[in-house]
């Protein structure tokens, strides 16, 4: 069975009170529409058709991809009208309709729904709620068969008492769609063309409407305002937390933990409070992450330790290495096994060999640092001349004294030592000691300046 997916994303979202189109508002670092597209792709359809309207150019710009067909809805005349705009592009056997502001829908739920759809049967996703206010109601006959969907504003009191609501997500035979779209009417309280009216048409045409429900009602929750958006965010984070804990992660507090990307984890991982994981993060076995850390597009090898208040981006921490507290690893930073980066150390495009150490108050940029080398406190690599970047190379077993300025390009060879307070501008040969500072001069009888007395 071939599949086309239509995603409705044309709404303005006035209750968001924002210049940003509603579907571009983020949940967990990705737009709501981005989440829906991600789920759609996992179903491997032959086409994904995104119906856009308000803020169309910005939506297209943010999400443009070769596998997406953007369809313009110039006037927002209802969900049925929106689907009709995509009709000329639909060639598959089945059409699945999704919504750009319903980001938490699970792929497994959609797979169960699609399994119920064929040329003689619609698949309709419904949800049972204690308070279904705002939802269209699922009307069934005495045998429990779905006969129609009545929108909330058009429902009578008896219909409003129904607890089963329409999520709007449905799978239907493409061969019938054009006929049903042509028969839609806007004779209703909203003056719109409701997609839900095809349910009654399908029943009248002798088709069966088979229903499916999500495991969790939050899967089908949309966001019309900032409060609902925050509810989706928190539910997403708790869901991700449960997923990670099921894989062997200890979260000190799942309510104070955020995932904003794709995270893969090993076993016996410990993550403290207020940790944010962004982009693609790989965490291997026995890793420990302290509180208040931000980790983005980073790999943490087995047994690595990230201490409190550290910020890592585009970095790789080797097996048994550690960083922090208050460490910053910028893109291109690599720590080999058992390397150590302490508090208030910043790395950028720097590679620390196995067992190398930079304990505190240090900046290392564009640097290659050999195994077991020790970097003293207050050391900086002077890697930028205002126009170009240059590299600092340190061999194995180098000892850099405190408060050194290493003016790149420069090489300090294996086993060399630099004295505290040195400004190193020339190569230091293997095993040598480099002293590059002014000789101390003591002045006897020195008197400190005195404040000038005001008259």
From Swiss-Prot:
Q: Where is this region: Linker?
A: 227-247
Top-level division of the source organism's lineage = Bacteria
The residues that cross the membrane are none
Q: Which residues take part in binding acetyl-CoA?
A: 377, 383-384, 402, 420, 437
Point out the coiled-coil segments of this chain.
none
Cofactors that this protein relies on: Mg(2+)
Q: Name one Pfam family in it.
A: NTP_transf_3
Give a GO cellular-component term.
Answer: cytoplasm
Q: Where is this region: N-acetyltransferase?
A: 248-455
Principal localization reads: cytoplasm
Q: Which CDD domains match?
A: GT2_GlmU_N_bac, LbH_GlmU_C
Q: How is the cofactor bound?
A: Binds 1 Mg(2+) ion per subunit.
What is known about what this protein does? Catalyzes the last two sequential reactions in the de novo biosynthetic pathway for UDP-N-acetylglucosamine (UDP-GlcNAc). The C-terminal domain catalyzes the transfer of acetyl group from acetyl coenzyme A to glucosamine-1-phosphate (GlcN-1-P) to produce N-acetylglucosamine-1-phosphate (GlcNAc-1-P), which is converted into UDP-GlcNAc by the transfer of uridine 5-monophosphate (from uridine 5-triphosphate), a reaction catalyzed by the N-terminal domain.
Protein's UniProt name: Bifunctional protein GlmU
Which species? Pseudomonas putida (strain ATCC 700007 / DSM 6899 / JCM 31910 / BCRC 17059 / LMG 24140 / F1)
């Amino acid at each position: 069975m071939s599949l086309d997916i239509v995603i409705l994303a044309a709404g303005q979202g006035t209750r968001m009170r924002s210049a940003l189109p509603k579907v571009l508002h983020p949940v967990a670092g990705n737009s709501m529409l981005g989440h829906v597209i991600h789920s759609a792709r996992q179903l491997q359809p032959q086409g994904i058709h995104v119906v856009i309207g308000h803020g169309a150019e910005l939506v297209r710009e943010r999400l443009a991809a070769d596998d997406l067909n953007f369809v313009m809805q110039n006037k927002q005349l209802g969900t049925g009208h929106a689907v009709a705009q995509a009709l000329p592009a639909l060639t598959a056997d089945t059409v699945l309709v999704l919504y750009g502001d319903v980001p938490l829908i699970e792929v497994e739920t959609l797979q169960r729904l699609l399994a119920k759809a064929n040329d003689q049967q619609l698949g309709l996703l419904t949800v049972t709620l204690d308070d279904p206010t705002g939802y269209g109601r699922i009307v069934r006959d005495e045998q429990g068969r779905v006969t129609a969907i009545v929108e909330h504003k058009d429902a009578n009191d008896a219909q409003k008492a129904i607890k089963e609501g329409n999520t709007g997500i449905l799978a239907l035979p493409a061969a019938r769609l054009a006929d049903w779209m042509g028969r839609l009417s806007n004779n209703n309280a909203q003056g719109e063309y409701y997609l839900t009216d095809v349910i009654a048409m399908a029943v009248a045409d002798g088709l069966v409407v088979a229903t499916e429900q999500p495991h969790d009602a939050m899967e089908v929750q949309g966001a019309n305002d900032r409060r609902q958006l925050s509810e989706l965010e928190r539910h997403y984070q708790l869901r991700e937390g449960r997923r990670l804990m099921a894989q062997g992660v200890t979260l000190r507090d799942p309510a104070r933990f955020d995932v904003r990307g794709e995270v893969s984890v090993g076993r016996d991982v410990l993550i403290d409070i207020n940790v944010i994981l962004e982009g693609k993060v790989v965490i291997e076995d026995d890793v420990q992450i302290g509180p208040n850390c931000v980790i983005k597009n980073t790999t943490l090898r087995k047994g690595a330790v990230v201490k409190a208040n550290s910020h890592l981006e585009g970095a790789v921490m080797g097996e048994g290495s550690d960083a922090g507290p208050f460490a910053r690893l910028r893109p291109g930073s690599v720590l080999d096994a058992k390397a150590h980066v302490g508090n208030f150390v910043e790395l950028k495009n720097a590679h620390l060999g196995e067992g190398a150490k930079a304990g505190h108050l240090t900046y290392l940029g564009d640097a290659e640092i050999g195994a077991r080398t020790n970097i003293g406190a207050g050391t900086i690599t002077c890697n930028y001349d205002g126009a170009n970047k240059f590299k600092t190379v340190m061999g194995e077993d180098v000892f850099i004294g405190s408060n050194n300025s290493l003016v790149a390009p420069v090489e300090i060879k294996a086993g060399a030592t630099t004295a505290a307070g040195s400004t190193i501008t020339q190569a230091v040969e293997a095993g040598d000691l480099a002293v590059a500072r002014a000789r101390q001069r003591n002045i006897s009888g020195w008197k400190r300046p005195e404040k000038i007395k005001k008259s």
